[in-house]
Amino acid sequence: MSKIFVNPSAIRAGMADLEMAEETVDLINRNIEDNQAHLQGEPIEVDSLPEDIKKLDISEGRSKSLVDNPQDVECRMSEDFQMDEVEDPNIQFQSYLDNIGIQIVRKMRTGERFFKIWSQTVEEIISYVGVNFPSQSGKTTENKSTQTTPKKVKTEPSSTPAKRSDQLSKTEMAAKTASGPPALEWSTTNDEDDVSVEAEIAHQIAESFSKKYKFPSRSSGIFLYNFEQLKMNLDDIVKEAKSVPGVTSLARDGLRLPLRCILGWVGSSHSKKFQLLVGSEKLNKIMQDDLNRYMSC
């Protein structure tokens, strides 16, 4: 019988990806609960109302008004019927996000990378929101057009459309400058770029977290050292690794990173044990050689 050996670093990377997926689902559910906090109020009990309000008979006034206007009865009945058929879009959106979270966890278990899954999920969520929650830009234009005076419309009918378009363009430009860049463009240019770089660096470091690398010692020999001996969180190691020249560009392109150079960089600034063992002059030369070799590939 042949035995199958599983690399512990692969298990750690998979567990970290699953934790990130679970945290993402929890964050989405928490945001939905915060947005629906106004819908979770307790109902008002009739017994807790004052005595004067209890004595009011609402049915009489309502029946008289309905009898006087039979057309209102039909309109209200039709409106109530239409409102019953329409479901709350927030509830549909919450169920949609729950299904998205389940799909993310399933894809993570198959071995796909978290950033690839998350980028596709973001596009799906944005398209869903754009279809089911359209912006109300038409209402703003109608309100602005009604503010024009009738005198200008009568005297200068040809110039009013141009003025209105100029006003709308100015207000739109002012709104854009005040609110900053659009959410989609901002996320694709900055947030997703940083997240992809950090995810790639964390993935490669996690794969070789227990691998030992050779470093020159003070006693003209060598010693072995790995990322586990740093006793640091993976997030802190990633932040320090981004300050190494050339690492960010390599991670953005999905290329292999000089992990020994990163380990030497982080260890020389955050590990006293590493500082006591390593020969600083030879370490600088090795780190520079590793960077040149990986950048030239």
Curated annotation (Swiss-Prot):
Subunit description: Homotrimer when phosphorylated. This trimer is stabilized by binding to the L protein. Binds soluble protein N, and ribonucleocapsid. Interacts with host STAT1, STAT2 and PML.
Provenance organism: Australian bat lyssavirus (isolate Human/AUS/1998)
Q: Where is this motif: Nuclear export signal?
A: 49-58
Example GO molecular function = RNA-directed RNA polymerase activity
Protein name, as recorded: Phosphoprotein
Taxonomic placement: Viruses, Riboviria, Orthornavirae, Negarnaviricota, Haploviricotina
GO BP annotations of the record are: symbiont-mediated suppression of host innate immune response; symbiont-mediated suppression of host JAK-STAT cascade via inhibition of STAT1 activity; symbiont-mediated suppression of host JAK-STAT cascade via inhibition of STAT2 activity; symbiont-mediated suppression of host type I interferon-mediated signaling pathway; viral transcription
Could you state what the record's PTM comment says about this protein?
A: Phosphorylated by host PKC and by an unknown kinase.
What is one Pfam family matched by this protein? Answer: PP_M1
